Amino acid sequence: MVKFYDREFGSRLLIGSALYPSPAIMQDSIRESGAEIVTVSLRRETAGGKAGDQFWSLIRELGVTVLPNTAGCRGVRDAVTTAKLARELFATSWIKLEVIADNDTLQPDVVGLVEAAQILIKDGFEVFPYCTEDLSVALRLVDAGCRVIMPWAAPIGSARGITNRDALKLLRDRLPDITLVVDAGLGAPSHAAEAMELGYDAVLLNTAIAKAEDPVAMARGFKLAIEAGRTGFEAGLMGARDFASPSTPVIGTPFWHAVS
């Protein structure tokens, strides 16, 4: 089980709802992933109007928990306003907080992110901040009251996988009581498994599944990879070594093979 604030979930995969070839494939992919939390963009979809009604009907049919986000927001005021609208529309205090600094890299504006998180937490929100892998930023977010931190592995949609393994490991080591979710930049199931092997609590995916040749099959692949990576972490991975270490003992081997 993984805990997000005061709620527990069985799946360690959070999934996005954008970019799928069709609404039906979106639904099938989410079901196949086993995800219990689905992120939605308030800026991309509307809760009113025919198109918006159809989208929300599809989401409701899945019986999942909705995590609205502030994707596309370029400043603190914009992000805070969007978060408050999301709370009214979806009757949830959860918000995936994104404050973007640059349109080319979609890198988080970490200064604005911390400020927005402080404002929203004081207003009763439970914030899921999308941030870089910088420990100092994560510590400021924790000080602001965030109990979930969502560092990127690489820029959104880049499919590069974990580019700064040491920094992500440091976050895990220094924040043992915080729920950590790798968010953005993963492109293959092996990337997700690596994140879980580092001890991360969950992974958030969208583009890697939605843009696959077979999104439904890819959703299943990520589900299995996350389960495998978590199992490996819990089992206790052996440490890497600089030199070889024989797995077969020399006791009982023929004498002519023994080293004198």
UniProtKB/Swiss-Prot annotation:
Binding site for 1-deoxy-D-xylulose 5-phosphate: 157, 184-185, 206-207
UniProt enzyme class: transferase
EC number of the protein: 2.8.1.10
BP-aspect Gene Ontology terms: thiamine diphosphate biosynthetic process
Catalytic function, reaction form: [ThiS sulfur-carrier protein]-C-terminal-Gly-aminoethanethioate + 2-iminoacetate + 1-deoxy-D-xylulose 5-phosphate = [ThiS sulfur-carrier protein]-C-terminal Gly-Gly + 2-[(2R,5Z)-2-carboxy-4-methylthiazol-5(2H)-ylidene]ethyl phosphate + 2 H2O + H(+)
Compartment(s): Cytoplasm
Active site: 96 (schiff-base intermediate with dxp)
Keywords, in A-Z order: Cytoplasm, Schiff base, Thiamine biosynthesis, Transferase
Listed pathway(s): Cofactor biosynthesis; thiamine diphosphate biosynthesis
Subunit structure: Homotetramer. Forms heterodimers with either ThiH or ThiS.
The protein, known as: Thiazole synthase
Gene from which the chain derives: thiG
